[in-house]
């Protein structure tokens, strides 16, 4: 819906924003959008706990049946800083291929509440 709204605009800002979004990981765009939606109703402390879990999942994607080197984060770093080809191979490659089932596990805390690193906020 965000992409469709931007595409319907004729303002240069909308066009440049679409160009930037087209270069980003479709999966992580969905995760970021879901994060914003969820954070609206959270306390700052709970939002920071959610954020910490997201960071963990970005580097340790066991919930996606991937190894640490197979993350969108690692792929973005590879394309930008290691190989410098600026051609990330996102998985999935299209926004329309991302499912709710791919996004939801990012929001399951890797820790029980009593063991969360930010439990005392």
Question: Where do the model's predicted regions map?
Answer:
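C-terminal alpha-helix plus adjacent terminal tail
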Residues: 1-121
């Amino acid at each position: 819906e965000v992409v469709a709204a931007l595409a319907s605009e004729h303002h240069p800002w909308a066009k440049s924003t679409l160009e930037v979004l087209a270069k980003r990981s479709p999966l992580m765009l969905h995760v970021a959008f879901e994060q914003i939606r969820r954070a609206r109703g959270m306390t700052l402390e709970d939002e920071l706990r959610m954020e910490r879990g997201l960071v963990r999942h970005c580097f340790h994607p066991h919930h996606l049946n991937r190894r640490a080197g197979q993350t969108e984060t690692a792929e973005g770093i590879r394309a930008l800083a290691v190989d410098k080809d600026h051609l990330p191979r996102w998985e999935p490659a299209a926004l329309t291929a991302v499912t709710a089932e791919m996004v939801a596990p990012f929001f399951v805390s890797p820790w029980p509440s009593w063991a969360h690193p930010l439990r005392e906020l």
